[in-house]
Curated annotation (Swiss-Prot):
Species per Swiss-Prot/TrEMBL record: Lactobacillus delbrueckii subsp. bulgaricus (strain ATCC 11842 / DSM 20081 / BCRC 10696 / JCM 1002 / NBRC 13953 / NCIMB 11778 / NCTC 12712 / WDCM 00102 / Lb 14)
Residues binding GTP: 16-23, 63-67, 124-127
Region annotated G4, chain positions: 124-127
Protein function: An essential GTPase that binds both GDP and GTP, with rapid nucleotide exchange. Plays a role in 16S rRNA processing and 30S ribosomal subunit biogenesis and possibly also in cell cycle regulation and energy metabolism.
Domain KH type-2 span(s) in chain numbering: 197-282
Biological processes, Gene Ontology terms: ribosomal small subunit assembly
Family: Belongs to the TRAFAC class TrmE-Era-EngA-EngB-Septin-like GTPase superfamily. Era GTPase family.
Residues of the Era-type G domain: 8-174
Top-rank taxon: Bacteria
Protein name: GTPase Era
Region annotated G2, chain positions: 42-46
MF term (GO), any: small ribosomal subunit rRNA binding
Keywords: Cell membrane, Cytoplasm, GTP-binding, Membrane, Nucleotide-binding, Ribosome biogenesis, RNA-binding, rRNA-binding
Length: 301
């Protein structure tokens, strides 16, 4: 009789500086959007787990906020979220941007140097550099730390992602299936819905507005005329930011609402009625009690 293949499973942390493509990679791996993306750094604020399942393997990818030096209570929360994600994982994927390789990566590499678990160097955005540039990039990182594997990919185009999964499978321990096959994230629906709304704010606004914004889902009620009713509040720090979010004659808030509703309907697979409110909460990023009330609690990390 042939030998039955053993089931493999494990937790994998996606770590790297802001805006290197961690959320894009996780969405690519999962095959559906579970983490928001934008061109702006610090898009991800919380640890978000995406779940990839095959017949003989399950990987729980933990997408972390990009590590950077803290300037506010929210920034400190985001750094701690990244570091705490390394406590109980089986493997770390340190993601870097091929276009900016070597610039400022020493800080993150220093955090990973002493880990006693495999660390992969994932070089993203290889579609934006010449193939001849890859070897010098790899050589430069070999001098920085000890990496089990070097994996060039393009998260946006999918290049190298299948090879990444095959390599992961070689390193993961034998283990059970932790989540049902149809689960793609460990986050509740209301959290993902709030992130979808925040993503559109990041995409549509500029300057200090995107990162001065938080979103809280007040309620998700079953069905008004066959639709899911979602009420959410957008918090900003200044009156001027509120005016920008609302826009002239409500034009901006309408755009945010329409785009968010479309993303939420794609995620949930049902029609949605979305209502948005905008409130000023001055200096909320420096208010630990308020941060905790909307889901950012350093003590839980």
């Amino acid at each position: 009789m042939g030998q039955t293949s053993k089931h493999k499973s494990g937790f994998v942390a996606l770590v790297g500086r802001p805006n290197v493509g961690k959320s894009t990679l996780m969405n690519r791996l999962i095959g559906q959007k579970v983490a928001i993306t934008s061109a702006k750094p610090q898009t991800t604020r919380n640890k978000i787990s995406g779940i990839y399942t095959e017949d003989d393997m399950q990987v729980v990818f933990v997408d972390t906020p990009g590590i950077f030096k803290s300037h506010s209570d929210l920034d400190e929360y985001m750094d701690k979220a990244s570091l705490s994600s390394l406590k109980d994982v089986d493997l770390v994927m340190f993601m870097v941007d091929a276009k900016e390789a070597g610039k400022g990566e020493e800080y993150v590499a220093g955090l990973l140097k002493d880990l006693d678990i495999p660390v992969f160097l994932v070089i993203n955005k290889i579609d934006q550099v010449h193939p001849n540039e890859l070897l010098p990039i790899i050589d430069s990182y070999q001098a920085v730390g000890k990496f089990a594997e070097f994996l060039p990919i393009s998260a946006r185009q999918g290049n190298g992602v299948d090879d990444l999964l095959k390599t992961l499978k070689d390193y993961l321990p034998e283990g059970p299936q932790y989540y049902a096959s149809d689960e793609i994230t460990d986050r509740p629906e209301y959290f993902v819905v709030a992130e979808m709304i925040r993503e559109q704010i990041l995409r549509l606004t500029d300057q200090e507005v995107p990162h001065s914004t938080a979103v809280w889902v007040d309620q998700m009620n079953q069905r008004i005329n066959g639709k899911l009713q979602i009420d959410a509040t957008i918090f900003v720090e200044k009156d001027g930011q509120k005016r920008i979010i609302i826009g002239q004659r409500g034009s901006m808030i309408k755009q945010i609402g329409m785009r968010s509703r479309k993303e939420i309907e794609n995620l949930l697979g049902e029609k949605v009625n979305l209502k948005l409110w905008v409130k000023v909460r001055r200096d909320w990023r420096q208010d630990p009690a308020f941060l905790k009330s909307i889901g950012y609690d350093k003590k839980e990390l």
